[in-house]
């Protein structure tokens, strides 16, 4: 099979492993990474998140701990071994992203979540599909009078929870996302219900005192904030 990794010198690598566990050195391929400002003076410490011919890694800007200096989430096309595009971020996403296919059948897209390793440690999400060549759903952030187009922020820690975030997001079967950062807090981020709508009444709607509610036949639609 193929294995993928990055280097602090700013390269993304792919290599095949033989059945006996040795590397197929002739299969080695690489991409010289670029940051969100188009500079190849970048580095990456991400373990790549790989799915459906695409890879997702964090890349640094010109200053490792300088805000909006070119940090970003690089989306790579593994068929052409090239950079598809880079989504700008405030801080350097130094660890791995987590990918969900939950909406792929519905929208054709996957969603990938990364943390900025820069206070307050924002959690960002990008959407992507094969053939996509530019970022979508960007939003604007302002810092010291300058405005930047950056990847969508899903959550921003505040007060005592705001800190650098050098962690991989972890998600359970219910969609709750777990993470920790340098504030020494372990946090769980879950969706909240904004609306409940009863679309079909239960079969039994009349009860005597002491009877238990029977929901048979009842249908309810829950709308989540995300």
Where are these predicted regions, by residue range?
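Extracytoplasmic/lumenal domain signature
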Residues: 1-192
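Beta-rich interaction/scaffold domains
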Residues: 192-226
């Amino acid at each position: 099979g193929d294995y993928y990794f990055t280097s602090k010198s700013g390269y993304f690598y792919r290599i095949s492993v033989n059945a006996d566990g040795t590397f197929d050195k002739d299969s080695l391929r690489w991409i010289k990474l670029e940051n969100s400002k188009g500079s190849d003076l970048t580095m990456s410490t991400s373990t790549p998140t790989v799915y459906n011919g695409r890879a997702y890694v964090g890349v640094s800007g010109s200053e490792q701990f300088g805000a909006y200096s070119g940090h970003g989430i690089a989306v790579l096309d593994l068929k052409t071994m090239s950079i598809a595009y880079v989504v700008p971020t405030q801080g350097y996403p130094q660890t791995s992203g987590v990918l969900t296919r939950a909406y792929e059948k519905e929208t054709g897209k996957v969603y990938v979540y990364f943390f900025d390793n820069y206070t307050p440690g924002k959690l960002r999400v990008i959407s992507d599909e094969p053939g996509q060549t530019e970022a979508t759903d960007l939003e604007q952030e302002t810092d010291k009078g300058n405005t930047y187009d950056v990847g969508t922020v899903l959550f921003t820690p505040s007060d005592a929870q705001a800190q650098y975030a050098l962690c991989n997001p972890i998600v359970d079967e219910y969609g709750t996302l777990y993470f920790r950062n340098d504030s020494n807090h372990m946090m769980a981020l879950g969706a909240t219900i904004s609306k409940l709508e009863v679309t079909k009444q239960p079969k039994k709607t009349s009860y005597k005192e002491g009877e238990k509610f029977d929901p048979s036949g009842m249908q309810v639609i829950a709308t989540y904030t995300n």
